[in-house]
Amino acid sequence: MKLKILSWNIWYDGDFEKISKFLSEFKADIVGLGEVVPDDPTRDTIAFMRKLGYQHILAPVLTIQKDGRTMSNALFSKYPIMKSKIHKLPDTKTDRRNAIQADIDVKGKIIHVFMTHLLHTHQKPDPIQESQVESLIKILTKENTIVMGDFNATPESVAIKKMRENLVDIELKPVSTLNSNLFDCPNCDPNIIPITRLDYIFLSQDIKAGSLKIHEANGSDHLGISTLIEI
């Protein structure tokens, strides 16, 4: 059984017309989206994905300071979500983080899907981000497991090295998952943005996968990533 998996930080100020067009045309089986803003009627991702036939789990993360909107993680599935849980991760006073877990029934086989968006550290080492990864690893299932999201960490970071010790990173070659035309962080080095990877799909050893694909959808400051898995 083959499944198309997509992970994308769609940016709370992204171009929703471009984002929704891509999501509609790509037709993934399971989708993890970061920076969903459910209380913004101009970009109602939840209603849009429901119309496409997805079940979903929503996990609020934090309040966007400039306008009071709620930024959330969201996981969507074309297959029945049998059980779900939102795991709280270590956080700061103003920046809450979590991981969504969904047990999904794919024609009689249960797969365990986790989606997260870790603390933004401007691509620098951070003990809170590292503790978030440690907490995530503790809750992971051992088999039939998919973990996806914006880890806000580069491949050489402690956080990603820890993930790779426990799961398979389907892409080991240097790639960028940031949109250099839109990614605008005054505290990040603009010279390395075109070669920076922050987004990942990890799998347990028992799941086969194709290569990582990076999508130039241009609606967000991150690029969508996908793979085709076989369970």
Positions of PLM-derived features:
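Acidic, histidine-bearing metal-coordination/catalytic regions of metal-dependent phosphoesterases
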Residues: 1-4, 61-63, 70, 228
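Acidic/histidine-rich helix-loop elements
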Residues: 4-13, 37-40, 65-66, 119-126, ...
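Active-site beta-strand/loop signature of hydrolases that rely on acidic residues for catalysis
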Residues: 5-9, 19-42, 76, 102, ...
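Active-site-proximal segments of metal-dependent phosphoesterases and phosphodiesterases across multiple
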Residues: 117-136, 155-167
